[in-house]
Amino acid sequence: MGNSMKSTPAPAERPLPNPEGLDSDFLAVLSDYPSPDISPPIFRRGEKLRVISDEGGWWKAISLSTGRESYIPGICVARVYHGWLFEGLGRDKAEELLQLPDTKVGSFMIRESETKKGFYSLSVRHRQVKHYRIFRLPNNWYYISPRLTFQCLEDLVNHYSEVADGLCCVLTTPCLTQSTAAPAVRASSSPVTLRQKTVDWRRVSRLQEDPEGTENPLGVDESLFSYGLRESIASYLSLTSEDNTSFDRKKKSISLMYGGSKRKSSFFSSPPYFED
């Protein structure tokens, strides 16, 4: 028999690692891949990917929004657990994801702190992205403010999802929740038909000057309006002619109240929160 050569078998796909016994919910794309300078990206920043296999530094994954399947290097993604616990991204990437279009105020993530290893940080979208350090006690309980501790991160998230309690705002939705939301379908509305010349607004000023004027001062076909609507128009015109002094007094009182509230707040110290 002649010599024969065996083809080298393809490397078997390794099972996914299980940190703390949890499978990641999805991968979050941190930057467009491939780079737009090289070719049109297959996966874009902010996309959520479902893992197919771990190829040793590379992931085989499928996009949850486009359905495209391909490989992506591990440095371009972060693993996400519980929908809000991000593993493998820093402060800058967290801010980029939280500032993506359609990200709502209160969107948040928890990530490993860059400045304190073994600790976590809570990043929240507000007017700007705010970062709060999460401390861990020797008994493995967590806290942001020392006066309030939690047995696990999930309890911490649940609490601050109900009340801000010193944070910049209430936690609303995990980061990237909107990235796979189905686009809203606008219900088709029936066409609106307008009748010509319902109200001659050029004659309104004359009505204010001469309330005892003609029988139909607005030039309106009264059959087109109910009695209540005609009364509403008349009430509106009478209100617009009133003096605005009451509004000025109200505005001044509001400004005084606001000034008083600012002075009052100095007597109450907010709970100590440590920004990361």
From Swiss-Prot:
GO molecular function, one term: phosphotyrosine residue binding
Keywords: Cytoplasm, Endosome, Lipoprotein, Myristate, Phosphoprotein, SH2 domain, SH3 domain
Any one GO CC term of the record: COP9 signalosome
Signal peptide span: none
A Pfam family of this chain: SH3_1
Residue ranges of domain SH2 in the record: 84-175
One GO BP: signal transduction
SMART domains noted in UniProt: SH2, SH3
SUPFAM superfamilies for this protein: SH2 domain, SH3-domain
Location(s) in or outside the cell: Cytoplasm; Endosome
Region annotated SLA C-terminal, chain positions: 212-276
Tissue and organ expression note: Expressed in lung and fetal brain. Weakly expressed in heart, adult brain, placenta, liver, skeletal muscle, kidney and pancreas.
Induction annotation: By all-trans retinoic acid (ATRA). Induction is indirect and is mediated through other proteins.
Main location: cytoplasm
Lipid-carrying residues in chain (N-myristoyl glycine): G2
Record keyword Metal-binding present: no
Effect of L229S: Abolishes interaction with CBL. Does not affect dimerization
Entry-annotated residues carrying Phosphoserine: S253
Record's subunit section: Interacts with EPHA2, VAV1, LCP2 and PDGFRB. Homodimer. Homodimerization and interaction with phosphorylated CBL occurs via its C-terminal domain. Interacts with phosphorylated proteins ZAP70, CD3Z, SYK and LAT via its SH2 domain.
Domain characteristics, as noted in the entry: The C-terminal domain is essential for the homodimerization and the interaction with CBL. While the interaction with CBL is apparently mediated via the hydrophobic region of this domain, the highly charged region is apparently required for the homodimerization.
Protein name: Src-like-adapter
Lineage: Eukaryota, Metazoa, Chordata, Craniata, Vertebrata
Primary gene name: SLA
